[in-house]
Each structure stands twice: as C-alpha cells, then as structure tokens.
Amino acid sequence: MNKRNCIFTAVFAFSLISAASVFAQSASQKLEHQTDEKDAPIVYFTKDVSSEGLMKVYKALNQKKQGKVGIKVSFGAPDEDVLKPALLTDLIKATDGTMIDSCGLSGNRWTAEMNLAHARKHGFDRVGSMQMLDEKSDIDMPVKKGYLLKYARTGSHFDEYDTLVSVFKFRMHFLPALDGAIKNVTLCLGSRSGKCLIHSGGSDSKHYHDTKPDVLEKSFADALRAALDYKKNWAFINVVDSYEPEDSCHGAKNTGNIGIIASRDPVALDQCSVDFVARTAENAEVRAAWEEAHQVKMLEYAENLGCGRRNYRLVEIK
C-alpha cells in the first residue's frame, strides 16, 4: 500500500471511529422527538444489523398476517448501494412474503424487466420471489382531504396484497428528498405515472417536474395518506446502516451501522431515523440545514394529515 492510500485509509477509519464515538456518547440521551407520553407511538430499535435483528423488531410490532404478504423494497439502480437482500431472509421465511417494487423514471429503470435485472444483480432473487407492481397496468388510490393530490397511483398488482411490510435502507444524506419509509410507500411505490403526479404536485401524470420543496413535501404526505387508507395492514422498518453521504451537507459523515428501527407509524419511524442521524451534526444550526436540505418538513405535513406522529416512545430490543 502506498503512502497516499495509507493516509486515506487512516482518515476513513478515523471518521468511522469518530461517528461511533458520537453515537456511543449520546446513546443514553433522549433523541430530539423521543417522549415518555403513554399515547405516543412505539418505535422499536436494535443495534443488531442482521436478518435476526430485523426479525426481532418486526416481531415486536405484532403485525397479524392476513392474505398475501408484500414486502415493499427498492430494487435500486444498477450501481446503487441498496438494502442488503440477506437482511430479508428470516422475514421472508416467516411471512412467505413477496418482494415488490415499481418502475422508475430513469432510462435504466423504465421497464419491469430492467428493474428485475437490477434486482437479480443485487441478489434479491437469492432470498425470495419478486414482483413489479406496474408491469401490466395502474390503479388509483384516493387522497382524502389532501394538500395537492386527488389520488396516488401505483401498479395494479398492488391489489393482490393484504399485508404490507416496508423495508428500506434509510439515508438522510442521499437524494434531496428524505430516503425513508415514507418515500418507499409513496414515490417508490408509485408507477411511472404515479411518480410524475408526485413530482408535479398532481398537475401532470406524464412528465417529470423539478418541483419546489414544499410542493414535493405536501405531495409525499398526500401519497402516504392514500397508501395508508388503501391498505390498512402496514408495518414499517428502516435499516440505518453504513453508507457514504452523497450530498454537500456540511459535516455529513458515514455514521456506520446505527441499527434497525421499526414501527407501525411511518411518521414516527422516519422521525426517529432522522433523529439518530441528525444528532451527529456538530450543532443545532447544522442540523437545521441538513433537515431543510432533505425536506424533512414532509414529516410535519404528514402528521397534520393524520398519517402518524413525530413524537414517539423508543424501545430498544437487545
């Protein structure tokens, strides 16, 4: 190893150690939206980032299996750092679930077969069966008293599932919009047409729009309301593991494996995930900048629509 590589390795290792140190020092401190209120939704957390760890928090949710089980994941782009398929092994065995996703707007995710090819490349086919929801046609899910959308749109195969489990690789410092459970069951659940509706605030179902943040945040909230009303039996799991930040946020770092978090409340789950990552910010001003950059206000809009609550009780499972 040459001198330059040695220096890079040392710096990278130091950054991971520093992130772990921050996490350890604050482990006994309450998170930003953590509460002791008895009526607050429960969020379960384990540091065990494994298939067994994921099953621990899933079992704690006590979701009753009804009919066919769909496990909503994102198969991702060809070179994307996606959820590790092996984490789903025990969940799929326990539920006999099918991994489901929808097509994307980019050229390499345009068709069902393209997406399934990426899924096979990432290894999802080695842990269970897969289905693209929108390989045939679309269905509309009504939005009741939303901000902008009249309906959200996904693939017609979604009607085949009665029990839904969202499992997502949570990333705060990735794309502009927060990468969590809400995104997984709104934009990622949407068919190509459904994605266009969200990006346009409901005005266009055929073309992508580079939308203002508040329009996108409200559209996410509307689409979440639609998904929760259309299918009642949901569980939500975020895997908050190691990844390299891909944005320009000041002070953003690889936090290493924080853990796996689960809840029946998607708003509480995403807020808790944000709180775990955002507490590594060097001060309140930096945290606020991170949250603004990644449109965290969508959680407030979703809460106001009755999709969940941002304050939560945290229960650690060891």
Feature map (PLM): residue ranges:
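Bacterial N-terminal signal peptides
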Residues: 10-19
